[in-house]
Amino acid sequence: MKDALPELNGKDYIEKLNDDYDIRFCRLDEFDELIEFIDKYWRKNHIFVLSKEMFDFQHLNLEENRYDFVIAKHRESGEIHSCFGFVTTHHFDPEIKPIIIWPAIWKTRDDIKVKGLGVSLFYYFKENLPVENISALGISPIALSIYKHWGFETGKIRHYVFPNQNLEEYYLCENIDRIEKRAMNDDDLKMVEINQEEYEAIGEDEEVFSNISRYKSKKYYISRFFKHPMYKYVFYALKDGEHVRAIIIARECGYKGHKCLRIVDYIGDVRYLGSVNHQLTDLMEEKKYEYIDLVEVGSDDDDLHAANFIDKDEVEGLVIPNYFEPFEKRNIYLDYAMRTVSDDKAIFFKADSDQDRPNMLVNEM
């Protein structure tokens, strides 16, 4: 396999760091040390500090008996000085062989001024894992500049909305009434909510799974969504008779009794979204949703427009919030960075990486 990040090879300072640091994957018995680092140097009362269940769901690697974190442990003091957490789809289905890495927490202590310490963690994981794709969603300006320096493809994550235009008042969003009313597409498919058992019964030869990402699998969606410890996701099968053409994976979000539906992942050809316009509208009416939104990278804009999903940036003054824990009524513009050795087109959704992760405990929401 090609090296996904050859720019880090031959860096003398990385080799020299081994004299002072033990750089490796985080052991299970170092959980308390890592969580203390996150709480003290990354974010106070982070969800991983508050919930070991959530941390284990995302980072506990039972296959390798470790956590999916690389740490730099100072040999003299025994303290963690830097950490790099990552998410893989392989984590949710070990049968997935091409490995995609989603960088998550990447932090070096502010008081530690050691050249290349954080970069050395990147070097370690790419030397110890057969990485095909490194993709980061929702990254800081500092991280973005580093990824650009390394030759990553970068850009803005797109945010689309399908409005409920039958409401007189909106609370979660602003100026959604400025979206021009469009003629609805005919519903050529039937949208049916399905549970885990019904999902598992869908044949592997169905069209929906012929369009699945090489980094995901049928089992991945079970482990990632149906077995989530805190969030409740809903699956909608888009059916043509008995055949499943696509599946919408979504989660209800809200604030003070006002609600929306967020499509966090999608299996199949995105053009099929345009074949259930009326049923999506009926769903919004039934559930009192202000809108349905979709955050993505890589889908065809024309296909989403044809499905009557509108890019929020195309409507002046339109505000569609991205943060609900806690709720912030403002637009959020997120960057992405991607580096791959595969020729396959990559499409990402909100639930990729750790973007659709709780920030608060359930009783605080």
Regions flagged by a language model, labelled:
Residues 97-110, 257-269:
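Conserved acetyl-CoA binding element of GNAT-fold acetyltransferases
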Residues 2-14, 88, 132-183, 234, ...:
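Active-site/acyl-donor-binding loops of N-acyltransferases
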Residues 105-108, 113-127, 271-283:
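Conserved acetyl-CoA-binding loop-helix of GNAT-fold acetyltransferases
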Residues 69, 80-83, 100, 131-135, ...:
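Beta-sheet entry/capping signal
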Residues 92-98, 112-116:
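Alpha-helix boundary/capping segments in eukaryotic regulatory proteins
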Residues 48, 65, 96, 118, ...:
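Active-site-proximal structural scaffolding
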Residues 20:
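Double-stranded DNA-binding cores of transcription factors and transposases
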Residues 2-8, 23-26, 30-77, 83-94, ...:
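Amide-forming acyltransferase catalytic core, primarily the GNAT-like/NAT-type
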